[in-house]
């Protein structure tokens, strides 16, 4: 069965991969993709510039792809 504790295998793999990211990347990715915040909103929450948030999302996505490739 592909359902494990309410998550399908793809969701569980993504959740585990997110846990391997540095906090700075994990936080912005979570706020943007799971909570739906814009880069501007995240910037205000974390006291960063919108461009810094954009860079962290970009780098975090790249690192996440590498982690998922390894699995």
Located regions from the model:
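The N-cap/first-turn positions of alpha helices
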Residues: 24-25
């Amino acid at each position: 069965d592909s359902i494990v504790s309410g998550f399908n295998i793809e969701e569980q793999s993504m959740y585990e991969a997110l846990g391997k990211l540095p906090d700075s990347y994990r936080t912005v990715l979570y706020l943007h993709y799971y909570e739906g915040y814009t880069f501007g909103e995240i910037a205000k929450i974390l006291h960063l510039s919108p461009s810094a948030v954009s860079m962290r999302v970009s780098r975090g996505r790249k690192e996440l792809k590498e982690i998922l490739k390894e699995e």
